[in-house]
Regions:
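Catalytic phosphate/metal-binding cores of nucleic-acid and nucleotide-processing enzymes, i.e., regions
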Residues: 2-126
Length: 126
């Protein structure tokens, strides 16, 4: 940083610049979640050979989990989150709960990934 130049504080920014910065952060957040999702899909295919992983259309049913995994005669849905503290969208709790009553559904993030995949493995093997 140049001598005498103060770092801009977010709240002091022009509203349009603040909006652009906010959008920038959301884009990074989504990119990171999508990276986690891509790695997760690869892990699922390795862990459950022959499974089919479908990325659900987020515009079709708001709050419906991101992924559906079909393996043998069983299925599961997974809602991917960048972190355990990531904000949940409206209806996500409802659909994860509803789908879990029918079969298996969880919120999954890097912090609980191992636990969720172990639970999923037990479900698919039962």
């Amino acid at each position: 940083m140049k001598r005498g130049v103060k770092k801009l504080i977010f709240k002091d920014m022009h509203p349009l610049l603040r909006l652009a910065k906010s959008h920038e952060r959301r884009s990074v957040y989504l990119m990171l979640e999508s990276q986690f999702q891509s790695k997760l899909i690869k892990k699922l295919k390795k862990l459950f050979p022959g499974c089919i992983v479908v990325k659900n259309d987020p515009g079709y049913l708001q709050g419906f989990p991101d992924l559906t995994v079909y393996y043998g005669d069983k299925w599961a849905t997974l809602e991917c989150k960048q972190s355990a503290g990531a904000k949940k969208q409206p209806n996500q709790e409802y659909y994860v709960g509803k789908m879990n009553e029918m079969s298996f559904s969880r919120f999954i993030c890097p912090e609980n990934e191992e636990e969720v995949l172990n639970d999923l493995q037990q479900t698919f093997q039962s």
